[in-house]
Amino acid sequence: MLSFISLVLSLSYLPLIITIYQQAHYHIKEYLNYFIRHFYLELLILMVYLIYFISGYNSLIMAFLILVYLLYLYSKLRIKLKFTKRIIRLFIILIPFLYINSYLCISYLFIFILCIPFFISNLIERKISHYYLKKAILKRKEFNHDVIGITGSFAKTTTKYFMSQILDDITPLATKASYNTLNGISLELNNHNLKYYNALILEMGSNHINDIKKLTSAFFPNIAVVTGIGPMHLDSFKNISNIIKEKMSIIDGLGEKGIAILNYDNEYLRNYSYNGTSYLISYGKNADFSYQILEDYVNIYAYNEFVFKFKNNGYDEIDISNMMPGIILGVLYKIDYNQMIFRLENIKRPASRQRILEIGNSIIIDDSFNSNLKGALKALEQLKHYNKKKIIITPGFVECKKLLPNLYLKYAKRINEICDYAYIVKLSTSKILYDLIKINHSYVRSVDEARLMLSFNNEAVLIENDVPDIYL
């Protein structure tokens, strides 16, 4: 009976555990950190076995209650388990461990025991990933058109998304969503017949030193765009100098025929001493390619010469900055200006990046994918223009822990000046922000919980930096 209870509890626990592991991007360390923060779950499991030994079959009732509770916890997860091929392979590896666990009745240690099959799974997945990476590298070598690599501490996905629209005439293939790792880019290249495309636009992300070098060594772009540098992922990079070195490594392998496109509105890039042999093009308010934002139009200049203008449909400096790499390449590719103007005036934003949704007489600004101060302040400025009750839902920021006090001083100041109410999603790092908020505010467990509290009666709601369950 004890082994049966153990098996049932293990099976009911499994969806929750595997989902958290998936949200941790299959990193065992992040997975363990989550459950160490939520260790009360394991204590409940232990309680079942203590009651069993004391009262025998009466523990079935308690086991049933725990089972229901575990399934309830899974139902409360905002991001549910996605049954990918990797997850299916993982479940196959887990089968013998479930049997061993039920036989030995060690559910109390189940979370930690699962690290063994996770480790085995990761070894297998590395072999599989290496196979598909080699396949993608071969396809890249056979591709005879431009490969554009986009990196930076922020705005990579938006810049890529804008660029693919501006350059539509040359039929580019852009990696979808935020696919910016070796596996993500390999998946995109392997899923498409590259003979139908005349350019590749590859977003290249980096959370650790040498991530960019691995990407450029595999897909060797001949055009590199750096959107900006800031204190992101400081927990892994340690200091801003390492971030600059990492991001700028994208231009190291370009060669004499390569093109490096840098955002000179960014202080770190503007002050960077470039000693490479590639052709350098800067963009910004005062750069090789510059812009002038007027009330009705945006003027574009190349080396102080007027190029064209397009209608300003509510664009601000960050929007135009994110458009500039696409505009530069459009000019270099000699795309018809009228076509570029039409696309710029009708450009679409990527999902969850300041998308505006209307619900009755209320609006929601969905900026849930943003995770940096600059973008958050921009979204607050957008919120300011609505003559409605202004509400922000935010957890703050989940990285740059050393800089959080300074970041939150600036963030809270604008929230207090602009908003009428703030819902703070409770994280381990959110108390600093919570204490700095002077307007009416309250804690919530998730963005979804805050949504349920909205009246949608003449409200303007900003959802800023939603986070997965792994951070909660």
PLM regions and their residue ranges:
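Extended acidic/charged loop-beta regions that coordinate divalent cations
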Residues: 39-63, 84, 94-100, 185-187, ...
